[in-house]
Amino acid sequence: MALKIRLRQQGRRNHVVYRLVLADVESPRDGRYIELLGWYDPHSTVNYQLKSERIFHWLNQGAELTEKAAVLIKQGAPGVYSELMAKKMTRKAVMCQKRRAYRQRRSLKRAETAQAVSK
């Protein structure tokens, strides 16, 4: 079951309000959700309220962000977003080091086989 943090449309005509929810990927936009993580009202002076500790928890559990939800979290809970980006960058750096080490081992092995063939 893949989970996404996304916006769920609420409200009435000409006054749309959004809820930030954790939902299954296959559920419809305004359908069933697992947990309410906050809300966003583009019409009021207090635009949003987010539960940053729950957002961070679900992101650590493997939930993915939609583009609009990422923008809202970056604006409303910058600490959560910066930690998420730092985690992604360290993961990317580790994978890059592993790839580099693998390529070096592979090139050494090819050089050894080329020497063995030339003898």
Swiss-Prot record:
InterPro entries: Ribosomal_bS16, Ribosomal_bS16_dom_sf. It comes from Chlamydia felis (strain Fe/C-56). GO terms for biological process: translation. Signal peptide: none annotated. GO terms for cellular component: cytoplasm; small ribosomal subunit. Keywords: Ribonucleoprotein, Ribosomal protein. GO terms for molecular function: structural constituent of ribosome. This is Small ribosomal subunit protein bS16. Transmembrane segments: none annotated. It comes from the Bacteria. Belongs to the bacterial ribosomal protein bS16 family.
